[in-house]
């Protein structure tokens, strides 16, 4: 495991199917290429997370998320509300497109997506050219890591790269809302 400032090393690791850790708004996240099934299964094994739960996709822009979302199942008002809320630490559960891999959406016909305002996430997703998975960096039953050092202690031997940086200082995970009902599914 390497601690890197250079985002290109993280992008190279992602392209090779590795799992990385990176700072987000509130905690460090674990990420991989959402379209790489081997990488996703590796990430889920590290987290001890069942594939049925699905994972969040995090991106630099909605354009990066659009291939994973079925906009035809949303009204113009619903889509406008979602887009007006970003970038922010706010995750929306949206209808999944037919191209969204089952290992991303889990047992659902939806996908959880977020456009982050964190500068490292923005740069990383732009350099990678697509969204990353975003799930809290921690082992099952352990608190989420909020510093690079915590990531290295808890997960260092299981991930390829830790991207240097700090969280934005938010406490806890992002809020999650349903794009169709606008209901809050997880308080942020």
From Swiss-Prot:
PROSITE patterns, per database record: YRDC
Pfam family, one: Sua5_yciO_yrdC
Reactions listed under catalytic activity: L-threonine + hydrogencarbonate + ATP = L-threonylcarbamoyladenylate + diphosphate + H2O
EC nos: 2.7.7.87
Coiled coil: none
Every YrdC-like domain range: 4-188
GO molecular function, one term: L-threonylcarbamoyladenylate synthase
Keyword ATP-binding applies: yes
Keyword ATP-binding listed: yes
Entry superkingdom: Bacteria
Subcellular location(s) of the protein: Cytoplasm
Key words, A-Z: ATP-binding, Cytoplasm, Nucleotide-binding, Nucleotidyltransferase, Transferase, tRNA processing
GO biological process: regulation of translational fidelity; tRNA threonylcarbamoyladenosine modification
Cellular component GO terms held in the UniProt record: cytoplasm
Family annotation (HAMAP family): TsaC
Similarity field: Belongs to the SUA5 family. TsaC subfamily.
The name this protein goes by in its record: Threonylcarbamoyl-AMP synthase
Organism: Vibrio cholerae serotype O1 (strain ATCC 39315 / El Tor Inaba N16961)
């Amino acid at each position: 495991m390497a601690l890197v400032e250079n985002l290109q090393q993280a992008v190279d690791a992602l392209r090779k199917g590795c799992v990385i850790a990176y700072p987000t708004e509130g905690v460090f996240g674990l990420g991989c290429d959402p379209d790489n099934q081997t990488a996703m299964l590796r990430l889920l094994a590290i987290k001890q997370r069942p594939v049925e739960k699905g994972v969040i996709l995090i991106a630099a822009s909605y354009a990066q998320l659009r291939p994973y979302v079925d906009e035809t199942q949303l009204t113009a008002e619903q889509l406008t509300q979602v887009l007006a809320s970003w970038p922010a630490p706010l995750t929306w559960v949206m209808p999944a497109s037919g191209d969204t891999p089952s290992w991303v959406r889990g047992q659902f016909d939806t996908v959880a997506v977020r456009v982050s305002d964190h500068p490292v996430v923005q740069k990383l997703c732009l350099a990678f050219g697509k969204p990353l998975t975003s799930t809290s960096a921690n082992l099952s039953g352990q608190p989420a890591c909020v510093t690079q050092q915590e990531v290295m202690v808890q997960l260092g031997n299981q991930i390829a790269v830790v991207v240097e940086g700090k969280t934005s200082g938010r406490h806890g995970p992002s809020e999650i809302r349903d794009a169709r009902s606008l209901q809050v599914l997880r308080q942020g």
